[in-house]
């Protein structure tokens, strides 16, 4: 009898367990059916019914896991500039599979218009060249808001697990006149592909949009579908993305802030890889790899090349190869001197740094300000290959009005340079002296005081420790091989090498020097870089090039960084500008008596008695015989 009773009890327990598992699975299936119920739109801006969007509940976070393996500040300071050994974050033990296997499987089986990130073309679709959005809005309206995407992560990411106890997140999206279906697709992808335990809040900041559908219609969609997770913040006047994001931070409530654009689609399991490094040390800032979404076809394309983000002295973004010690495996986060676009950062650390500089106007320079600030003030920035976010690529923006200043880029760049770049700021100003002289950077006392209070490192530390290859690629400070400024003839005082603004069409000439040492004339301002190129300082890619054999003229051509006829060396002892790597040819001035314009010739055999081959160069490299070894 006792045996029969035990069997009955076991059967009852088995039935209860089976019922519990079935309930959980059915709950997930119900949620997925809500997602599947989303239908394609008809192409009209007002035909985006709220029922297309899945409802999402926020589950309370309950966890009591073993502590993660972390880095203290001293360990982080050592790791972030490490060069001799492979760069690795601590390998964690208490790990969890965060990827939703059921959703991933269903997503991979979907077919239809735009599904799997495939290109879509409408026969009669046209792009208005004056369209603010600069993409096919009609096409976006046809593609499902919750469309499936290809898994573009490296293979090694697909089996990777992450810490069980990760912080919750506020996603911040600032927008101005974003097309409604594009904005809703951004939101839908975030909600569908983020663990409910982690995604607590999305703050949408409307930066004074004019499109009517972004008003009441957006409010109704959010109220009906996401009342507990999405908060819409309306700004009464246009303030720019920098100030808009800071307004969102003030209403955020989570431990980690994630900044995203309003025209994105997040990919599979994108969030946990961004959060784990922040748990290891809250001074680590992370960014996903940005895949490309075509503005014409909405095709989703993988970004294959792993690069770091950098800048030139125009403060334009540059892509640079990653350090050799950061290269493998391809699922490992790696260091980058600059982060742009999307970003995940610990809220307390961000606010302790002073947040974004709200005196930066509209957009753009904040990526440099936050990057310099993080690296120089105790933090580290990482790209995370296992986190992928698709981004609609738009053409370079046309000139737009600024809510606060008529030339906001010059103001922004000067403000960042004055606060963070120390002596290196002159290389930014050298690119356009007149512009930066007129630019008003605003009041800087508070930002400089904050930097001093944080005991941040110098910009020279940043250039030599964080981005040492910048000094090889671009103009270096106080290098014996480098000059910046005029190239004045010793034989013909007051005459300088002049491009005459005839790029690629005529040779450079010897002409009367214009300007003065502290501000050379626009067409007489030259820089000898550590690539041994003599660049026209006010142009980012025009270099002096010797033409043909001996006694030939010198022209201005596009810089190619391959040496050869664009390779120059300044010999301080003899004041020669030598051409080529055998150092037997010299630049020579020729000026006939009574003439106002002379010739600049290359490939003349160097002769120390030939005064026409001697040049006074720049304002950073005065003649000093002790600096010349031969």
Swiss-Prot record:
Keywords recorded for this protein, A-Z: Disulfide bond, Glycoprotein, Glycosyltransferase, Golgi apparatus, Lectin, Manganese, Membrane, Metal-binding, Signal-anchor, Transferase, Transmembrane, Transmembrane helix
GO cellular component: Golgi apparatus; Golgi membrane
A Pfam family matched in the record: Glycos_transf_2
Intrachain disulfide bonds: 157-386, 377-456, 496-513, 543-559, 586-606
Keyword Metal-binding listed: yes
Record InterPro entries: GalNAc-T, Glyco_trans_2-like, Nucleotide-diphossugar_trans, Ricin_B-like_lectins, Ricin_B_lectin
SUPFAM superfamilies according to UniProt: Nucleotide-diphospho-sugar transferases, Ricin B-like lectins
Main location: Golgi
Binding site for substrate: 207, 238, 262, 363
Residues annotated as domain Ricin B-type lectin: 483-618
Region feature (Catalytic subdomain A): 166-277
Protein topology in the membrane: Single-pass type II membrane protein
Lumenal side: 27-630
Tissue: During embryonic stages 9-11, weakly expressed in the mesoderm. During embryonic stages 12-13, very weak expression is observed in the somatic mesoderm region. No expression detected from stage 14-15. During embryonic stages 16-17, expressed in the epidermis and the antennomaxillary complex. In third instar larvae, expressed ubiquitously in wing, eye-antennal, leg and haltere imaginal disks.
Glycosylation (residues): 72, 84, 146, 168, 525
Pathway named in the protein's UniProt entry: Protein modification; protein glycosylation
Cofactor(s) this protein requires: Mn(2+)
Localization, UniProt: Golgi apparatus membrane
Family: Belongs to the glycosyltransferase 2 family. GalNAc-T subfamily.
Name of protein: Putative polypeptide N-acetylgalactosaminyltransferase 10
Gene it is expressed from: pgant10
């Amino acid at each position: 009898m006792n045996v029969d009773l035990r069997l009955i009890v076991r059967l009852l327990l088995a039935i209860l367990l089976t019922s519990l598992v079935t309930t959980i699975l059915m709950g997930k299936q119900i949620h997925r059916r809500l997602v599947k119920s989303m239908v394609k739109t008809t192409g009209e801006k007002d035909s985006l019914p709220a029922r297309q969007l899945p409802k999402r509940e926020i589950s309370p976070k309950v966890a009591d896991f073993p502590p993660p393996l972390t880095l203290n500040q001293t360990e982080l300071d050592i790791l972030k500039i490490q060069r001799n050994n492979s760069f690795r974050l601590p390998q964690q033990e208490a790990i969890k599979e965060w990827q939703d296997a059921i959703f991933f499987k269903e997503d991979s089986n979907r077919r239809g218009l735009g599904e799997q990130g495939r290109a879509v073309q409408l026969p009669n679709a046209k792009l208005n060249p004056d369209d603010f959005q600069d993409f096919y809005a009609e096409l976006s309206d046809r593609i499902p808001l919750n469309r499936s995407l290809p898994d573009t992560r490296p293979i090694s990411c697909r089996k990777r697990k992450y810490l069980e106890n990760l912080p919750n997140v506020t996603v911040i999206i600032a927008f101005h006149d974003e097309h409604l279906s594009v904005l809703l697709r951004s939101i839908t992808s975030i909600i569908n592909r983020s663990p409910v335990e982690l995604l607590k809040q999305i703050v949408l900041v409307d930066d004074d949009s004019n499109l009517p559908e972004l008003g009441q219609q957006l409010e109704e969609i959010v109220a009906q579908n996401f009342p507990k997770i999405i908060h819409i913040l309306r700004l009464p006047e246009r303030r720019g993305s920098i100030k808009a994001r800071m307004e969102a931070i003030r209403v955020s409530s989570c431990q980690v802030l994630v900044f995203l654009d309003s025209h994105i689609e997040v990919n599979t399991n994108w969030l946990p890889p961004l959060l784990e490094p922040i748990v290891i040390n809250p001074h680590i800032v992370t960014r996903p790899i940005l895949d490309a979404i075509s503005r014409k076809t909405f095709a989703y394309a993988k970004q294959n090349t792993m690069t770091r983000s950098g800048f030139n002295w125009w403060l334009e973004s540059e892509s640079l190869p990653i350090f050799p010690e950061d290269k493998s495996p391809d699922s490992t986060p790696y260091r980058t001197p600059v982060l742009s676009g999307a970003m995940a950062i610990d809220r307390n650390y961000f606010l302790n740094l002073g947040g974004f500089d709200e005196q930066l106007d509209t957009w753009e320079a904040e990526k440099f300000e936050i990057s310099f600030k993080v690296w120089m003030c105790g933090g580290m920035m990482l790209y995370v290959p296992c986190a992928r976010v698709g981004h609609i690529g738009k053409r370079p923006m046309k000139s737009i009005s600024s809510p606060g200043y008529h030339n906001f880029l010059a103001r922004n760049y000067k403000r960042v340079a004055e606060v963070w770049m120390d002596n290196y700021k002159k290389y930014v100003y050298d690119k356009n002296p007149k512009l930066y002289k007129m630019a008003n950077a605003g009041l800087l006392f508070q930002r400089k005081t904050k930097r001093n209070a944080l005991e941040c490192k110098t910009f020279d530390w940043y250039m030599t420790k964080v981005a040492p290859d910048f000094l090889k690629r671009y103009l270096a400070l106080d290098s014996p091989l480098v000059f910046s400024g005029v190239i004045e003839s010793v034989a013909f005082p007051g005459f300088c090498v002049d491009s005459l603004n005839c790029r690629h069409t005529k040779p450079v000439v010897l002409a009367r020097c214009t300007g003065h040492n502290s501000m050379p004339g626009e067409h007489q301002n030259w820089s000898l870089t550590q690539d041994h190129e003599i660049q026209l300082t006010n142009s980012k890619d025009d270099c002096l090039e010797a033409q043909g054999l001996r006694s030939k003229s010198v022209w201005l051509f596009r810089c190619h960084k391959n040496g050869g006829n664009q390779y120059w060396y300044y010999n301080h002892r003899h004041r020669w500008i030598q051409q080529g790597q055998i150092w037997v040819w010299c630049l020579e001035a020729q000026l006939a008596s009574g003439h106002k314009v002379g010739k600049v010739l290359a490939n003349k055999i160097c002769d120390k008695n030939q005064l026409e081959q001697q040049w006074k160069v720049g304002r950073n490299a005065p003649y000093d015989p002790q600096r010349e070894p031969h």
